[in-house]
Regions:
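Long, intrinsically disordered, low-complexity accessory segments associated with secretion
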Residues: 1-187
Length: 187
């Protein structure tokens, strides 16, 4: 594993073994191998007005701190996530992260969710009301976040909260179940 050093405000990662890199080439080495990092596994969808029918993105969310199994400055780059199934390590997904300092929130999009879909349709006879349905065909409850743009909207309905410029609907969708939200926009 690489060892972190600091030179002023620049972080260096020294590789503890000799490595040869040919001219105009690159070499990948593991920066970090953590057997257990505490993460929240959730699904997210960002939508605007109009019809939507499709899958959601699967994210892993954590804080970059020792209590969660991290706690070092993380440089931008690729991330691979694995899980143990029947005694074997299997790839769950791959994503990218930006630079993250210690204590910062880390979100990694690791792919498209299977078995969970969102469908939004305008309510017949209206121009400002929408029905949003999230269905879960999986055998486990899934935590879903739907983000609706806040800028020119006035949203009414459901349990919506403001977060980072978005209206957020966060819901647990039961196994083989669905959750619905009806909301209105005012432009």
């Amino acid at each position: 594993m690489a060892e972190q050093e600091q030179l002023g405000d620049v972080r260096l990662y020294r590789i503890p073994i000799e490595v040869t890199v040919a001219a105009r080439s690159q070499k990948q080495v593991a920066l970090l191998r953590q057997p257990a990092v505490r993460v929240e596994n959730l699904l997210r969808l960002r939508i605007g007005p109009g019809d939507v029918d499709g899958p959601l993105q699967r994210l892993l969310v954590t804080r970059n701190r020792p209590a969660e199994g991290l706690g070092l400055a993380l440089p931008a780059g690729k991330v691979a996530t694995f899980a143990m199934r029947d005694g074997r390590r299997i790839l769950i997904g791959e994503g990218r992260i930006d630079d993250h300092t210690i204590g910062e929130k880390v979100e990694i999009t690791i792919g498209t969710a299977t078995g969970v879909r969102a469908r939004q349709r305008s309510v017949p006879g209206t121009t400002d009301a929408y029905d949003l349905t999230v269905t879960n065909d999986l055998a486990e409850t899934q935590t879903v976040e739907v983000e609706l743009p806040l800028d020119s909207w006035s949203l009414k309905g459901g349990k919506l909260v403001k977060r980072e410029g978005w209206m957020l609907w966060r819901v647990n969708v039961p196994a083989n179940g669905r959750r619905e939200l009806r909301y209105r926009i005012k432009m």
